[in-house]
Amino acid sequence: MTMRAARLSGSTGLTAALVAVLLVLTGCASLPESSAPQALGTIDREPTSEGPTPPIAGRDPDLLLRDFLQATADPTNRHLAARQYMTPAASAQWDDSTSTTIVEKPDTLLESRDGDRATYRIRAQRMAELSADGAYRAVNEPTLENKIEMVKVDGEWRIAELPDGVVMDITAFTKSYRRYVLYFADPSGNTAVPDLRWLSVPKNQLTQRLLSLLSEGPHGAIGAVVRNQLAAPVALRGPITKANGDPDDVGVGLGGVRLDFAGAAALSQRDKELLAGQVVLTLAQADIPGPYMLLADGRPLDERYATNGWSAADVEYLSPSVQAQNRIGLHALRDGALTQVTDNGVVETPGYFGSVNNLQSAALSPDGQLVAAVADAGRPAPEPPRTLMVGTYGGPAFPVAEGGSITRPSWTGDGSAAWAVIDGDRVIRAVNDRATGTVSVQGVDISGLTADPAGPALRLPITELRISRTGVRAALIADGKVYVAVVERRPDGGYALTAPVPVAVGLSTKATSLSWIGGDTLLIAREGNIDPVSTVLIDGSEWTPVTSQNLTPPVRVITAAPGAQYVADSRGVLELTSNTTSELHYWTEMPGLVGTDAAPVLPG
């Protein structure tokens, strides 16, 4: 492996994950709509636990330590499973709440052993840190080293001294924890913003845990730029039950969920819909099936759903994966012009962008009505060789900025602005006024990227910038490394990029291109022949190589949407396809898009 995070495989490949989401949505949407909801039992009732498995008798101390690093992945009862490996005194002194570190390849190194006492040092590669609220943060920090004192108690080795905080092996983490998604609302209230959490919770406690986390709000810097309808003065009122009022095993099997929100009756109709969207999307993604009977101060939150309850289909329009669907088809650059890929072949688009031969990169607004492109100005040095052009699809265009280098433009989800980076250190927004047809250029404050007090500053230049469809996050490549930053709108109307978080931690080669898939996953291309294309979640977890079958590196450009991924390699443009009779994935050449100057273009 050339990247450590590849070992985190809490879910299967990207395609399987997307299929799972669709199954959740369609499954919930197919519930009967003509009758009142009934509790149908607990088909997948979980077995009652009889407590954690005790340590193996007669275990050698080094093997006992390895078992301990597996047991720490069970957080139940303040890590009772792990405390069994300690002496009573050590268990009483150990504070498991200070930190949680996920490691790989732990070594147990013997430093000394004398009769019934032994000293070991655990040495392991840090992979991530896990917050108390389940937020995962990938790290690339020095090797972890913990000194462990062990003694024999009644003939069995036990841990007598250890540092505070939880250390767990990645293999145990992926078995015990599962990824969940909390949803909050973007500032405009038009889309749901994902916030990933990793939890180890029994199914019959999961509904309560997720709603508690929703009420606590988003994690980290994203909290400043999203809306949370499940926040004061709105709060859960009374017990969480099944749809028929049964309080037992809520979320286990069929039967739905009944929730009452105090203070929600005073919300506007739109805010009630956003509250329902947050709750229903969060629960549906966690495989907690509906119907979802939502009340506001004891009465239906919305009379339209008073009888049959809400389903995932009722709020899926807020899902970032649904909004990121490509609705205008594939386009491409070929011979310096913008073309459209049709059933009859590749044809030039009308207007300016299809008639020129000097385009280096291009981006389409989500509705396909606007185009931003970087053109080779053809000017001799020292004049700036690149020009950012903005115009209508099929119509004219005009220059809005110039520079020595300009990144591939990226449109916001509403098509109001195209973002780009000039000369690697200046971020701009080309703001389109559809009423007047004019475009103005607005600078973006990036001081929060290079001097972030909350974490390590990134190093310029920025060579790629992609705005998420939710509008509150930006993925970027700086000095060959991948980050996800927060898009912050200032009170004066200006914008800033802040709080960069490294996500593709440990890449052995530089990243060259990236694209959003939905709202929480990135597709990344990098230099080299080994795993040149991969996916990673926005918290840095689940780094997964994508097949390289039929690719001829280097991979120059990638672009993606849910269910559609394209790359441009040394031969031309290829699409990720799958065998209809197996799970085999491979890249297929796109007819008519061959050559080193061809590049795929999707909305965004």
Curated annotation (Swiss-Prot):
Residue positions bearing lipid (N-palmitoyl cysteine): 28
Location in or out of the cell: Cell membrane
Keywords assigned: Cell membrane, Lipoprotein, Membrane, Palmitate, Signal
Residue positions bearing lipid (S-diacylglycerol cysteine): 28
Record-linked PROSITE patterns: PROKAR_LIPOPROTEIN
Membrane topology, from the record: Lipid-anchor
Residue ranges of the region described as Disordered: 35-60
Similarity annotation: Belongs to the LpqB lipoprotein family.
Protein name according to UniProt: Lipoprotein LpqB
Organism of provenance: Nocardia farcinica (strain IFM 10152)
The gene coding this protein: lpqB
